[in-house]
């Protein structure tokens, strides 16, 4: 398809930055001397802005049609504001910088997802082949940085991230603005679509799914390090999980052909509940932890691909920017932020096991909701 590599390389660097941020930011803050409460709060800031920023940018993009220009604008400001971390590392300064940086960083991806589906047109099944490169970027950085931080100080993480954020901006220049003209217009308003029962159930389930990821995204690396896993091994385990999700992206077209989307979505939630139980109870068993990481094929790969498919089925190009923004803000934003805060406040008091238990329970609730009320499609 046209623009395949231009789209793919953006995902490569965007999720490459995510592969540096999610596994190692908690360790970086831990090295600076912050306790679990502070780490949870600082991680939550990045997710809180995801509740607001994407919706603002999504509304602007859909009403102006300037999706790629907004991606470029938000990407360059991401670099500018994140560079402020080099000035000071106090808690109050980090709060300000993380808020400003993430307000723009979180704005770019939903609009780029809308651009991707716009360009795919009648070939949405090719999304997995493009999004796969984001997973490749995640693997490269998480594995490379895991090895790197065995030899250099993790306090250099911000400098490395600035380089990755700069690459995001550069790759956004590869897509011409005229390539992203809307293809279809809906006769229904955005409000009418989001009040459909299936859409409501989707967003509730996505919120719960990302809520359950709180202990994982915030403390998984610290949890592993506390149980004598090396940073190289920590990076390898993160990378393994993403390798598994790539496998799912490669076969999504066949899965959509053979199985109903609602069944695939519910299955991803159920497998995620099992994954949290395995991590909580068997952290000292490397074979079980390896198996648990392979389950990321379902807890992110399958889950995200099916969610994208349902959104594409329900929202026209006219509303894709707002739809992608709402998906990000409700799930990764609200769900992720609340999950991060809960795990931050309970980690030192109740320990890892309790955190992964409540995460599993949340997933089971999501299973019941999606199984009972999501349309059989």
Spans of features found by a protein language model:
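Helix-loop boundary and gating motifs at the non-cytosolic
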Residues: 1-47, 199-237
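Interfacial helix-cap and linker-helix signal at transmembrane-aqueous boundaries
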Residues: 29-30, 60-61, 132, 147-152, ...
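Structural signature of the two symmetry-related core transmembrane helices
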Residues: 69-83, 263-278
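Juxtamembrane intracellular "pre-TM" segments in multi-pass secondary transporters
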Residues: 1, 172-206
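A membrane-interface helix-boundary motif in multi-pass transporters
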Residues: 147-163, 344-363
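Hydrophobic core of transmembrane alpha-helices in multi-pass small-molecule transporters
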Residues: 12, 81-82, 91-109, 207, ...
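Cytoplasmic helix-loop-helix junction between adjacent transmembrane helices
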Residues: 99-133
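Helix-to-loop junctions at the C-terminal end of transmembrane segments
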Residues: 52-66, 149-150, 248-261, 347
């Amino acid at each position: 398809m046209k623009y395949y590599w231009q789209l793919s390389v953006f995902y490569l660097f965007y999720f490459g930055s995510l592969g540096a941020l999610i596994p190692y930011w908690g360790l970086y803050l831990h090295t600076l001397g912050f306790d679990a409460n502070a780490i949870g709060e600082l991680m939550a800031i990045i997710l809180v802005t995801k509740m607001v920023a994407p919706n603002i940018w999504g509304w602007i993009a859909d009403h102006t049609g300037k999706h790629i220009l907004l991606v470029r604008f938000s990407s360059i400001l991401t670099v500018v504001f994140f560079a402020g971390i080099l000035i000071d590392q106090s808690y109050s300064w980090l709060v300000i910088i993380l808020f400003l940086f993430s307000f723009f960083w979180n704005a770019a991806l939903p609009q780029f997802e809308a651009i991707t589906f716009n360009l795919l047109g009648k070939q949405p099944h090719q999304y997995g082949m493009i999004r796969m490169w984001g997973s490749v970027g995640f693997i490269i950085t998480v594995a490379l940085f895991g090895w790197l931080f065995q030899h250099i100080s993790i306090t250099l993480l911000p400098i490395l991230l600035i380089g990755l954020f700069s690459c995001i901006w550069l790759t956004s220049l590869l897509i011409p603005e005229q390539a992203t003209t809307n293809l279809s217009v809906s006769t229904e308003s955005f409000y009418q679509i989001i009040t459909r029962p299936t859409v409501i159930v989707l967003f509730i389930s996505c919120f719960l799914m990302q809520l359950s990821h709180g202990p994982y995204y915030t403390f998984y690396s610290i949890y592993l390090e506390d149980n004598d896993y090396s940073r190289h091994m920590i990076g390898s385990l993160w990378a393994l999980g993403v390798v598994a999700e790539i496998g799912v992206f490669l076969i999504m077209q066949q899965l959509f052909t053979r199985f109903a989307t609602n069944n695939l979505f519910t299955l991803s939630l159920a497998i995620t509940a099992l994954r949290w139980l395995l991590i909580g109870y068997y952290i000292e068993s490397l074979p079980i932890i390896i198996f648990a990481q392979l389950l990321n094929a379902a807890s992110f790969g399958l889950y995200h691909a099916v969610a994208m498919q349902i959104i594409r089925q329900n929202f026209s190009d006219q509303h894709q920017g707002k739809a992608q923004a709402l998906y990000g803000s409700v799930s990764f934003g609200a769900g992720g932020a609340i999950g991060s805060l809960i795990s931050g406040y309970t980690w030192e008091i109740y320990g890892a096991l309790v955190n992964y238990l409540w995460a599993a329970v949340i997933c089971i609730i999501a299973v019941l909701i999606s199984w009972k009320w999501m349309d059989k499609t």
